[in-house]
Swiss-Prot record:
Keywords, ordered alphabetically: Acetylation, Cell membrane, Golgi apparatus, Isopeptide bond, Lipoprotein, Membrane, Palmitate, Phosphoprotein, Ubl conjugation
Subunit text: Homooligomer. Interacts with GLIPR2. Interacts with NOSTRIN. Interacts with SNAP25 and STX1A. Interacts (via the N-terminus) with DPP4; the interaction is direct. Interacts with CTNNB1, CDH1 and JUP. Interacts with PACSIN2; this interaction induces membrane tubulation. Interacts with SLC7A9. Interacts with BMX and BTK. Interacts with TGFBR1. Interacts with CAVIN3 (via leucine-zipper domain) in a cholesterol-sensitive manner. Interacts with CAVIN1. Interacts with EHD2 in a cholesterol-dependent manner.
Residues where Phosphotyrosine is found: 6, 14, 25
Residues carrying lipid (S-palmitoyl cysteine): 133, 143, 156
Protein name: Caveolin-1
One MF term in the entry's GO annotations: transmembrane transporter binding
Topological relation to the membrane, as annotated: Peripheral membrane protein
Family: Belongs to the caveolin family.
Record lineage: Eukaryota, Metazoa, Chordata, Craniata, Vertebrata
Function recorded in the entry: May act as a scaffolding protein within caveolar membranes. Forms a stable heterooligomeric complex with CAV2 that targets to lipid rafts and drives caveolae formation. Mediates the recruitment of CAVIN proteins (CAVIN1/2/3/4) to the caveolae. Interacts directly with G-protein alpha subunits and can functionally regulate their activity. Involved in the costimulatory signal essential for T-cell receptor (TCR)-mediated T-cell activation. Its binding to DPP4 induces T-cell proliferation and NF-kappa-B activation in a T-cell receptor/CD3-dependent manner.
Record organism: Loxodonta africana
């Protein structure tokens, strides 16, 4: 066992010795070892998607649920022929349905790519720029706040206390003369 390499009882070679409680590569605790092998890892990138309910968080409930009745309506007394009304309904519904599918087929993946890149950049900037800047600012402002606190307690507190004592002795009496 030279050169900092260690071999365990099963013949595995390690660069670090196995301690009594084990290490991250080979725990001595059998329960812990079994738990590590039995854990199921769930990855957010490989989760199953629901092809039936595609808006589980109801993001677009009030925005894009536009039906024929929401757009075109004939008031009482001004009705077109029933056949025209049915054909208009069918034309509107089918056109909206298939044109949405066509646009989704043409632009869905590129838009998903663009929005994925955008939110990746946004997340990156938030994690690596915004939060550290805010933390840095809070650390730096602590020094200024201590100096400001000393200034207020040294100069402003006595001044305003004296002004308060001056004005506390003023009495106002109001009388109504008839």
């Amino acid at each position: 066992m030279s050169g900092g390499k260690y071999v365990d009882s099963e013949g595995h070679l390690y660069t670090a010795p196995i301690r009594e409680q084990g290490n991250i590569y080979k725990p001595n605790n059998r329960d812990m070892a079994e738990e590590m092998h039995e854990k199921q890892v769930y990855d957010a990138h490989t989760k199953e998607i629901d092809l039936v309910n595609r808006d589980p968080k109801h993001l677009n409930d009030d925005v894009v649920k536009i039906d024929f009745e929401d757009v075109i309506a004939e008031p009482e007394g001004t009705h077109s022929f029933d056949g025209i009304w049915k054909a208009s309904f069918t034309t509107f519904t089918v056109t909206k349905y298939w044109f949405y599918r066509l646009l989704s087929a043409l632009f869905g993946i590129p838009m998903a790519l663009i929005w994925g890149i955008y939110f990746a950049i946004l997340s990156f900037l938030h994690i690596w720029a915004v939060v550290p800047c805010i933390k840095s600012f809070l650390i730096e402002i602590q020094c200024i706040s201590r100096v400001y606190s000393i200034y207020v307690h040294t100069f402003c507190d006595p001044l305003f206390e004296a002004i308060g004592k001056i004005f506390s002795s003023i009495r106002i009496n109001m009388q109504k003369e008839i």
